């Protein structure tokens, strides 16, 4: 298996899943600032020119792009991290789509307006931080009666946690959400999760409490965002 993640929630979803499933894989890191994700070779893997993507060398170099699709493929390939019965599978997919259609887009936009844009557009910041927090409360309420999102540990937990763990970076508080915090701690206690978020190794820490460091990291990421504003977004 070949994987092209980046130190970004969507990339971490795939690297965590690969570690949890104990699948051997080759990590290929693209230089996004140089536009390596837009080369003809990579566009054959993902026509949208974004990461992550995986190539299954055991299946005639079958390529999968979009992080959620990668997670589903890996789960179905191995028969792990997602039930095979219709109801169990549906529970996992519901919470996976909750992340893909809600948590990810809302937190992603909160990051952009709160951390990256040189101009501060407060209504946009308030909108995306507020919606992210509302979605956090949905998770907190559901986790009051469930150890993991679908009941048992799954790709849905991996997908949501990869984003929720960066709440500080988005400027969103998790105060008053004890069930969400319990789940976050449970996820972080898993060795494969800890290893997955180190793939690829990076000096960027989206959970830092050091505001000076946060500004430094934001400046590094801002260049990619500016590229995205010109129509060449990478993530």
What do these predicted regions represent?
Residues 43, 90-93, 159, 181, ...:
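Generic structural signal for individual residues within well-ordered alpha-helical segments
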Residues 1-126, 130, 227-235:
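GST-like domain detector, emphasizing the conserved glutathione-binding G-site
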Residues 5-15, 19-22, 26, 31, ...:
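Domain-wide signal for the mature, well-folded portions of proteins, strongly enriched
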Residues 45-51, 196-200, 216-219:
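Short, structured secondary-structure boundary patches
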Residues 74, 96-191, 233-235:
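GST-like fold's C-terminal all-alpha helical module
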Residues 200-235:
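Acidic/histidine-enriched, glycine/proline-rich intrinsically disordered or flexible terminal extensions
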Residues 35-36, 185, 204-206:
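Short secondary-structure boundary/hinge segments and terminal tails
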Residues 88-89, 138-145, 168, 198-214:
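A short, terminal or domain-edge coil/loop segment
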């Amino acid at each position: 298996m070949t994987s092209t993640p980046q130190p970004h929630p969507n990339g971490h979803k795939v690297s965590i899943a690969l570690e949890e499933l104990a699948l051997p894989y080759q990590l290929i890191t693209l230089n996004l600032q140089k536009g390596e994700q837009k080369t003809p070779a990579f566009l054959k893997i993902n026509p949208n020119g974004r990461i992550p993507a995986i190539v299954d060398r055991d299946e005639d170099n079958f390529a999968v792009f979009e992080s959620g699709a990668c997670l589903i493929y890996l789960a179905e390939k191995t028969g792990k991290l997602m039930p095979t019965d219709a109801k169990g599978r549906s529970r996992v997919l519901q919470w996976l789509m909750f992340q893909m259609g809600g948590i990810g887009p809302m937190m992603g936009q909160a990051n952009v307006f709160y951390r990256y844009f040189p101009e501060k557009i407060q209504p946009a910041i308030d909108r995306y931080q507020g919606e992210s927090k509302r979605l956090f409360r949905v998770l907190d309420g559901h986790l009051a009666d469930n150890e993991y999102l679908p009941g048992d540990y799954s790709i849905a937990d991996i997908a949501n946690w990869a984003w929720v763990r960066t709440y500080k970076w988005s400027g969103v508080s998790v105060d008053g959400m004890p069930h969400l915090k319990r789940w976050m701690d449970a996820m972080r206690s898993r060795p494969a999760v800890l290893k997955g978020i180190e793939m690829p190794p990076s000096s960027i820490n989206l959970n830092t409490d050091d505001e000076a460091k946060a500004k430094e990291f934001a400046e590094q990421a801002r260049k990619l965002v500016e590229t995205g504003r010109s129509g060449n977004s990478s993530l």
